[in-house]
């Protein structure tokens, strides 16, 4: 599987914030998107997963010679956790499992993977900020999508949870998954190398594509 972005431009509030942005990632690889606040990291991720239309350019996901709809192949984890506070943790994850299809881990195993075993009966709104984020990470595990698009995924996590999520990302890559992550802090993926010696993690600095810098 291969994801290509070609000559993308994105706008916010009617003003172009980045342009001439291109990249390619393949199976088992990750792209870490960095840059100052307001540089367009979140806008780029929303364009890639189809939540926003690009001002220019295109995004294409292919498997062999077949074009695959990005929306059908990706998990998107944004700033918001996208969970109903009044529903239990289990009910929220069950909704997303059925909505996304492609069952992977069962809910209990997914919660155990984020060190939240035993909370599935609790209302989501009862959880702490860090626990809520970990439930949202568990959402990535209860149904299989090859492409993870995650925006500041470690927000609200402690160091132990950050390390646990880094290992989950590495495992996803080992299973031929792809990851695009926007972040302002290290995600613990630096230095990942394939068996052939190729770097599996690339970085993209949004500052290099800002309209001011290009002008």
Curated annotation (Swiss-Prot):
Belongs to the ABC transporter superfamily. CcmA exporter (TC 3.A.1.107) family. It comes from Brucella abortus (strain 2308). The keyword Zinc does not apply. Part of the ABC transporter complex CcmAB involved in the biogenesis of c-type cytochromes; once thought to export heme, this seems not to be the case, but its exact role is uncertain. Responsible for energy coupling to the transport system. ATP binds at residues 35-42. This is Cytochrome c biogenesis ATP-binding export protein CcmA. One of its GO terms (molecular function) is ATP hydrolysis activity. CDD domains: ABC_CcmA_heme_exporter (cd03231).
